[in-house]
């Protein structure tokens, strides 16, 4: 019996003790538990990844909606500003037109007043000239006849 035989016997006894103590089952259970734990962690990681992708897609969608809404707001503001500008321009043009018309009316009134004043002055001058000419050339009897004729003409024009 040499040392190899005793080493073989020791190995057989060791294997028998290991089998008797159910070490292979414990190793199997430990490996199974570890595999289950790894499987659960992988499933949890997959679930978290899917949730993250859903959140990312939702944030992209919300960002696009916000960009679209901002674009709509800017377009609406531009339309309103353009409308306000056109309204202000129209109101200014109307104001200028009213002021021009009023100024033209004042000018026309001033022209009419000036023409009437010139005519009145001309009439006064003509009456004064006619009066002085008549005073020099007409005697009292002819003046009375002229006065009566003029009075008759005025009466006929008034009736």
From Swiss-Prot:
GO CC terms, sorted: plasma membrane; proton-transporting ATP synthase complex
Location of the protein in the cell: Cell inner membrane
Principal localisation: membrane
Classification via InterPro entries: ATP_synth_b/b'su_bac/chlpt, ATP_synthase_B_chain
The keyword Transcription regulation is annotated on this UniProt entry: no
Pfam families: ATP-synt_B
Record keywords, A-Z: ATP synthesis, Cell inner membrane, Cell membrane, CF(0), Hydrogen ion transport, Ion transport, Membrane, Transmembrane, Transmembrane helix, Transport
Single GO MF annotation: proton-transporting ATPase activity, rotational mechanism
Matches recorded under CDD domains: ATP-synt_Fo_b
Membrane-protein topology: Single-pass membrane protein
Highest taxon of source: Bacteria
Cystine pairings recorded for this chain: none
Ranges that cross the membrane: 1-21
Function statement: F(1)F(0) ATP synthase produces ATP from ADP in the presence of a proton or sodium gradient. F-type ATPases consist of two structural domains, F(1) containing the extramembraneous catalytic core and F(0) containing the membrane proton channel, linked together by a central stalk and a peripheral stalk. During catalysis, ATP synthesis in the catalytic domain of F(1) is coupled via a rotary mechanism of the central stalk subunits to proton translocation. Component of the F(0) channel, it forms part of the peripheral stalk, linking F(1) to F(0).
Subunit structure comment from the entry: F-type ATPases have 2 components, F(1) - the catalytic core - and F(0) - the membrane proton channel. F(1) has five subunits: alpha(3), beta(3), gamma(1), delta(1), epsilon(1). F(0) has three main subunits: a(1), b(2) and c(10-14). The alpha and beta chains form an alternating ring which encloses part of the gamma chain. F(1) is attached to F(0) by a central stalk formed by the gamma and epsilon chains, while a peripheral stalk is formed by the delta and b chains.
Family: Belongs to the ATPase B chain family.
The name this protein goes by in its record: ATP synthase subunit b 2
């Amino acid at each position: 019996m040499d040392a190899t035989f005793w080493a073989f016997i020791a190995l057989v006894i060791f294997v028998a003790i290991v089998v008797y103590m159910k070490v292979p089952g414990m190793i199997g259970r430990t490996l199974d538990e570890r595999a289950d734990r790894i499987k659960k962690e992988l499933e949890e990681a997959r679930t978290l990844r899917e949730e993250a992708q859903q959140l990312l897609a939702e944030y992209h969608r919300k960002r696009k909606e916000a960009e679209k809404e901002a674009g709509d707001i800017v377009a609406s503001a531009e339309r309103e500003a353009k409308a306000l500008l056109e309204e202000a321009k129209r109101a200014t043009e109307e104001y200028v037109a009213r002021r021009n018309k009023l100024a033209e009316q004042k000018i026309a009134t001033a022209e009419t007043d000036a023409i009437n004043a010139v005519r009145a002055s001309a009439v006064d001058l003509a009456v004064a000239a006619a009066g002085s000419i008549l005073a020099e050339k007409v005697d009292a009897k002819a003046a009375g006849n002229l006065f009566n004729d003029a009075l008759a003409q005025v009466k006929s024009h008034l009736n």
